[in-house]
Amino acid sequence: MPIQSAHDLLNRSLIYYQGRPVGTAAACDERVSAANYNECFIRDFVPSALVFLMTGRHDIVRNFLETVMHLSGHQHVMKGHRRSMGLMPASFHVVREDGEEKVVTDFGDRAIGRVTPVDSAMWWMILLRAYVVTTGDQAFAEREDVQGYIANILDLYLRERFESSPTPAFFPAAKSGDCRRSRP
């Protein structure tokens, strides 16, 4: 019975966009006061996605991968900075206004500490690999848009410096180099 109740809770947490399940909300309890708990967090969706993959609900994971990939270029760009094309949002949710559905993203603007979500894209790539291994849908991973996005992620993570927001203002040690590890 506990496993069935966990599956029921997972099903209640599904977020839909254009009639398709695209993720899960962080919490289903409306009494929870955190403003963003109705959102799907990229990193936190991965355990749910693994359950969906193990139970044959592959479409939810594929919908998530596609939706999040297309959200990557939506981040607000601060003056003096440029858009980091491989960056993914920390979270997203769907709003309905005037009969239209719209996906609203958070690239760290509403997060605790306002930290840029640099790990989201890695979780997306890990989940992409799990999806392909589980489903055998290699064609999805080989699509031109998916390959282009993987290239953007690798470009983001392999460049010498990462600039999307003024992180040193929040972490003074990073600005002075005090947080560097000793290298042999």
Each predicted region: which residue ranges?
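Acidic, mature catalytic/reactive cores of soluble proteins
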Residues: M1-P184
